[in-house]
């Protein structure tokens, strides 16, 4: 791999996925040994030219020599494109980049509900994404649909149970949010949506555990 020298990714150390792929960039040689740095370890000098709010939402790539910063998809395309220029070229196509930015935002704004973590009050600065109603609701809808689809397909394998339909599974998946949210009405909308996001993450991960069985059944019946 071609190493991108003097560049540092500022990652959210409380995000397992962020930690995984930034470490991966270093191990495969895309970045040098100083190619990643926890967001909470930013120096006062770095905070002068880094947009802290933007870096909380989109991983920042710091050019240590020129003191410039790229954010989000631009930073990832820069790192990957240094070793694979064609990927950067494809990623910068207008329509593809638009999709990549939306996908990145969808994951980034929801990363704290996808994999929750304890708050570290002792840190001077924390990498906490801004709350987005749009992306939180989209995540909840996505999780409901995926959970319902998985349960619908799995129910077809249960011979001793009545044949279900997608609408029923959809109502059950959505209904659990409504039922449990009744007990949260005294809280604000953000708290309710955060809880709903965490709830649907559990449901989504649970349904994903059934996926290997569905795949195995599909292969057997080919």
Predicted regions located by residue number:
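Thiol/selenol-based redox catalytic cores and closely related redox-interacting motifs
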Residues: 46, 52-157, 208-221
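Local sequence-structure signature of Cys/Sec-based thiol-disulfide redox active-site neighborhoods
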Residues: 2-31
